[in-house]
Swiss-Prot record:
It is found in: Cytoplasm; Membrane; Nucleus. InterPro entries: Cortactin-Actin_Reg, Cortactin-binding_p2_N. The modification Phosphothreonine is found at T984, T992. The keyword Cytoplasm applies. Gene3D superfamilies: 1.20.5.1700. This is Filamin A-interacting protein 1-like. PANTHER family: FILAMIN A-INTERACTING PROTEIN 1-LIKE (PTHR23166:SF4), FILAMIN/GPBP-INTERACTING PROTEIN (PTHR23166). It comes from Mus musculus. The lineage of its organism: Eukaryota, Metazoa, Chordata, Craniata, Vertebrata. It comes from the Eukaryota. Residues 50-62 have a biased composition (Basic and acidic residues). Belongs to the FILIP1 family. Disulfide bonds: none annotated. GO terms for biological process: gene expression; hindgut development; proteasomal protein catabolic process; protein localization; protein secretion. Residues 1-62 are annotated as: Disordered.
Length: 1131
């Protein structure tokens, strides 16, 4: 305030010059106005006298003023007024104190500025005055002080927070320091462990170097042995080349033979084609005859239908004409009656005319009668016309009848002709049926021929395939020659390569030393990386452990909460059950109270109102309390439901937590796997660190290179060995091919024989056809030989009984099971041969296990399969008068007790022998004789077939051949492979005989005892022992005794069951017999059977079973001491 007063006091003397300046400006304004009007100057200077003059001279000068003058005066007055207002404002502004102005405007400035502002406010006519500005800032200052206090308080709070955070950071830093110290300790321990491992690995490397030196010495020894083997292999390769050349020469010879065989096969194919063409021509002729017969029958049936239709039409026309005749005859009778009446009327007229002429009657009656008579005459004339017409119609009808009678006669003649034709056609139909039967039989024969041709074509295809295989084998052999040559060149180049490799090895060692230095630097960098990786892994494991502990704590808490909630739920459920029981009790009470109320109201309506109201109030209060309790219970139930919902939510949360726990567990496992992987990498890096020394690594590299060299050499040696094995296999193949070639030649010969038989049959058929044509021409020359006689004339078919298929006798396979165990056969003791009551005797021989089955499957040629759909295993048993027949038996149904005669008569001059097997009764149809002439030129493999003289229905026979060999004989690889060929399952095909056979079962074991190599071959030609059984199965089988002998001389044994055993002794063999059991009709499955073994597989006979007999003469000239062998040849 002092400053304001002092400013006011100091500014007071300064106002005087301001005022003087303001007055000067007013005077200037006045001068400007007076310049416009000079008269006003005087008035301005002396206003009072002008006014006085105007007042004095008013009446004299008022009329002299014009309108413009008045307007000028008014404008002067306005200017004066404005100037007065301005002066008043200036004066007011000058009069106001400076302090008031400062208080009004709120700032301290020079006084002139404040006065100017005040003047402007007066001119603008603003608010006259305002409040004091110095009062507001004090309130605002108080507010500012309060705000400063609040901000001070907040700053203090923030400072406290900062202090707390600072303390926390200090604590964390201390914890981190502690953890760092622990980590450093662990890392020191880890480094110590690594150093220990380094030392251990160095020791291991020292041991390895020592072992490598030993290995190098061993490898040098091996290299020496390998070089020796190389020299041997080179010599062996040269031997193989020589053998291959020899084999190629043999293959060329075989090619020539195969070409000859192919030419013969082509010739047979040409013959077959001619036979097929003839058969096709006969089929075409048969089809033409059938077509002609069909056309004739169709024409005959059409003509017959037309004639029958005509006959029916004529019958209907005859009936109509007869009806018309009957009607006309009736009309004729009527007309005759009318004629009679007319004649009577004419006679009456004549009488009347006579009377008229005489004049007997009167005119009037006469005239009436005459009129009536005229009318009658007119009617009669009309009837006469009708009669004339009827007579004409009768004439026409008679003519038609005559024509129809003529036609009916013609038709009768035609019907007679047709009946004759019908009889002729019926005869033709009979002839057609017979011809159809004949055609059917011809078709059957043709189909059989087609089947045979198909089989021949299949065999030719198989031959072509075999030829192709042989060509492929030749190509393989050529390739093997080329490969052998290449291998020899490679062996030469290998020696050069080894020398070059030694030179390159020294250079590679230098390069490896350079690489070692680079790898050491890389190892250091990788070690640094590994340390960082380990730190990260340790941190991750800590995090994983923390997360595990947190998850376990959460799980524990959640399980606790869940258990508590379950307990609470159980308690609440019990409470709820109690409350529900209470509610039901209260409801029952309410119902009883309501009933009581009703009774009470009924009984006590007449009592006092006060008592009733009090009781009612009490009861109402009770009801209200009960209702309140019910509401409380409802609320509790709602709370229980809410708690159940919460429990469900907690269970869901528990499941989610379990899932999280499982996920965290998986993460922890993954991290542990990564840790293990890192540890493995660390181990690898440690190993790399251990191999720092250049000398050790040089030795290691050299070792690896030497190992690679030795592996390369061993591989080459193995390859050479494999090639040698392949050459051995090719040798085996060639041997097998030779055997197959011989078999194929046999099959070709058999096929040629078959083709000849087929040609003979076709010629016989053609002769029979020509004969039947001749018969048909002789019987019916009008039909041009179209009819063929009955099929019984030329058919060779024999009625056979159906063979009942029975299950095979598995008990007879016991010797097979006993014979083969672990790939070797048991050796039978000689003591067992002397025991006649032994149940089972096993033929044993030793088989080498080196024969491989898959190799033999390729080499095996199966026997011919069956042509008809019979069982595949070939095990069929037939019944003969109720008794089971074994699969190898040929049934001869003759009376039991009759003997069978076998006569062997050798001729020593011509080196031949004849074998006759006859039955005594030739009168019966089942008797038979079979004879054979056996040439013997001293060779052990002479064969001859026994041709049967009588035909009987064939039954499947299963003859099993036994291959026998000396126990001490050794086998070459070729014989091993050929021996194993019988073990393939492809030989188990069913075989059906087509031709008729002798009713004798021949179980044979044939072979040559001369060569030990051929003793292992499965073919029946090359088996070394001889044992034959001729068996005739009768209707009844009685108990029988079986005799055996081990003598070298031949023996013929007859038994009680009509079996004839011809045993031909050999010094190496022991006999084979089936189990000796009495076979009765009640137990047919125990039928005795004698089986042979062919390496554990059963061979089967094919469609022809022919016996071959080999005779080897002995030193004695006696006829009974020649050794005879009967064996089966498989076609």
């Amino acid at each position: 305030m002092r400053s304001r007063s002092s400013n006011a006091e100091g500014s007071a003397p300064k106002q005087i010059p301001r005022h003087s300046k303001f007055q000067d400006s007013i005077q200037d304004m006045k001068h400007r106005t007076h310049k416009k009007d000079p008269s006003c100057e005087s008035e301005g200077v002396l206003p009072r006298p002008v006014s006085e003059k105007s007042h004095t001279g008013k009446g004299h000068h008022t009329e002299d003023l014009s309108r413009d003058d008045l307007l000028f005066l008014l404008s002067i007055l306005e200017g004066e007024l404005q100037a007065r207002d301005e002066v008043i404002g200036i004066l007011r502004a000058e009069k106001i104190d400076l302090a008031l102005l400062e208080a009004q405007y709120g700032f301290v400035t020079p006084k002139k500025v404040l006065e100017a502002l005040q003047r402007d406010a007066f001119q603008a006519k603003s608010a006259p005055w305002q409040e004091d500005i110095y009062e507001k800032p004090m309130n605002e200052l108080d507010k500012v002080v309060e705000k400063h206090k609040e901000s001070h308080r907040r700053i203090l709070e923030q400072l406290l927070m900062v202090e707390r955070s600072h303390r926390q950071t200090i604590m964390e830093m201390e914890e981190e320091k502690r953890k760092h110290k622990e980590y450093m300790k662990k890392s020191d321990e880890f480094i110590n462990l690594l150093e220990q491992e380094c030392e251990r690995l160095k020791k291991l490397i020292d041991q390895e170097t020592a072992s490598q030196e030993k290995k190098e010495q061993e490898k040098e020894k091996r290299i020496k042995t390998l070089k020796e083997e190389l020299t041997k292999l080179k010599s062996f390769a040269l031997m193989v080349v020589d053998e291959q050349q020899r084999l190629t020469a043999q293959l060329a010879l075989q090619r020539q033979k195969i070409q000859a065989l192919t030419t013969s096969a082509k010739e047979t194919q040409g013959k077959l084609a001619l036979a097929e063409a003839r058969a096709q021509e006969e089929e075409q002729k048969a089809t033409r005859l059938e077509k002609e017969l069909q056309t004739q029958t169709t024409e005959f049936h059409q003509n017959q239908d037309k004639i029958m239709a005509k006959l029916t039409n004529e019958d209907s026309q005859n009936r109509q004409l007869r009806q018309k005749l009957a009607a006309l005859s009736r009309q004729i009778d009527e007309l005759e009656e009318t004629n009679r009446s007319l004649r009577k009327a004419e006679e009456e007229l004549q009488d009347i005319k006579d009377k008229i002429n005489k004049g007997e009657y009167g005119n009037s009656g006469i005239m009436d009668e005459v009129d009536e008579l005229r009318k009658r005459v007119l009617d009669m004339e009309g009837k006469d016309e009708e009669l004339i017409k009827m007579e004409e119609q009768c004439r026409d009808l008679n003519k038609r009848l005559e024509k129809e009678t003529v036609q009916s006669k013609d038709f009768k003649l035609e019907v007679d002709k047709l009946s004759v034709r019908i009889t002729a056609l019926e005869k033709l139909e009979d002839a057609l049926d017979k011809s159809k039967q004949e055609c059917y039989s011809l078709k059957c024969n043709l189909e059989k021929e087609k089947m045979t041709t198909k089989q021949l074509s299949e065999e030719l295809e198989s031959l072509n395939a075999r030829i192709k295989e042989l060509e492929a084998i030749e190509s393989r052999l050529e390739k093997t020659e080329i490969t052998l040559k290449d291998d020899l060149t490679k062996l030469k180049t290998l020696t050069v390569m080894l020398v070059d490799e030694r030179k390159t090895m020294s250079e590679k060692l230098k390069q490896t030393e350079d690489k070692l230095q680079s790898t050491t630097s890389q190892l250091q960098a990788e070690q640094n990386k590994v340390t960082t990786v380990t730190e990260k892994l340790i941190e991750e494991t800590k995090r994983a452990l923390k997360s595990k502990t947190d998850a376990e704590e959460k799980m524990y808490s959640v399980t606790k909460e869940r258990d508590d909630l379950r307990n609470k739920l159980k308690a609440e459920e019990e409470k709820g059950h109690d409350l529900l029981s209470k509610v039901t009790i209260l409801k029952n009470r309410l119902q009883s109270l309501e009933a009581i109320e009703k009774d009470f109201v009924k009984n006590k309506l007449n009592q006092d109102s006060s008592k009733s109201t009090a009781a009612l109030h009490q009861e109402n209060n009770k009801i209200k309390e009960l209702s309140q309790e019910v509401e409380n219970l409802k609320l509790k139930l709602k709370d229980m439901k809410a708690i159940e919902d919460d429990l469900m939510k907690t269970e869901d949360e528990y499941e989610t937590l379990e899932r999280r726990y499982a996920n965290e567990r998986d993460k922890a496992q993954f991290l542990s796997q990564e840790l293990e992987h890192a540890k493995m990498e660390l181990a690898k890096y440690k190993l790399a660190e251990k191999t720092e020394s250049s000398h050790e690594q040089w030795l290691f590299r050299r070792l690896q290179e030497e190992e690679a060299k030795s592996g390369h050499l061993s591989r080459e040696v193995d390859a050479l060995k494999e090639k040698i094995h392949e050459y051995m296999a090719t040798e085996d193949l060639i041997c097998h091919l030779q055997g197959d070639h011989s078999l194929l030649q046999k099959k070709l010969n058999q096929q040629e024989n078959r083709n000849r038989d087929l040609g003979r049959e076709i010629e016989n058929l053609t002769k029979e056809l020509e004969r039947y044509r001749h018969f048909s021409k002789s019987l019916r020359p009008s039909l041009n030989g179209r009819r063929i006689s009955d099929p019984q004339v030329f058919s060779k078919e024999v009625q056979t009984e159906a063979a009942d298929s029975e299950p095979p006798d598995y008990k007879s396979l016991i010797p097979l099971e006993r014979a083969v165990i672990n790939g070797q056969f048991y050796e039978e003791n000689e003591d067992q041969d002397d025991d006649p009551n032994e149940e089972e005797s096993v033929l044993s021989f030793r088989c080498s296990q080196s024969s491989s089955l898959p190799m033999n499957r390729k080499l095996w040629i199966p026997w011919m399969k069956s042509k008809e759909g019979h069982p595949q295993n070939g095990k069929i048993q037939t019944k003969s008068n109720g008794n089971f027949v074994q699969p190898g038996d040929l049934v001869l149904s003759h009376t039991p007790g009759q003997p069978l005669h076998i006569k062997v008569t050798p001729d020593h001059i011509q080196n031949t022998a004849t074998l006759e097997i006859t039955s005594p009764t030739t009168e019966s149809p089942h008797s038979y004789t079979s004879t054979a002439v056996i040439p013997n030129c001293g060779t052990p493999k002479q064969r001859i077939t026994i041709l049967q003289n009588a035909s009987i229905t064939p039954i499947k026979s299963k003859s099993s051949t036994e291959s026998l060999m000396n126990l001490e004989q050794s086998m070459s690889p070729v014989t091993m492979a050929t021996f194993a060929r019988a073990q393939t399952p492809e030989s188990c095909g069913s075989v059906t005989p087509e031709r008729t056979m002798s009713p004798i079962q021949v179980l044979a074991m044939t072979g040559s005892p001369s060569s030990p190599e051929q003793g292992c071959s499965p073919e029946p030609i090359e088996i070394s022992a001889k044992h034959a059984i001729f068996r005739v199965s009768p209707d009844r089988q009685s108990s029988w005794q079986f005799q055996r002998s081990n003598s070298n001389s031949s023996s013929v044994i007859t038994t009680e069951d009509n079996k004839i055993h011809i045993h031909l002794g050999s010094p190496y063999m022991q006999a084979v017999a089936g189990p000796m059991r009495p076979a009765s009709p009640s137990a047919p499955l125990q039928d005795n059977r004698t089986q042979g073994l062919t390496n554990g597989a059963l061979n089967k006979t094919t469609n022809k079973v022919t016996s071959s007999i080999t005779i080897t003469p002995t030193a004695t000239p006696l006829p009974r001491q020649s050794q005879i062998t009967v064996s089966n040849i498989y076609n």
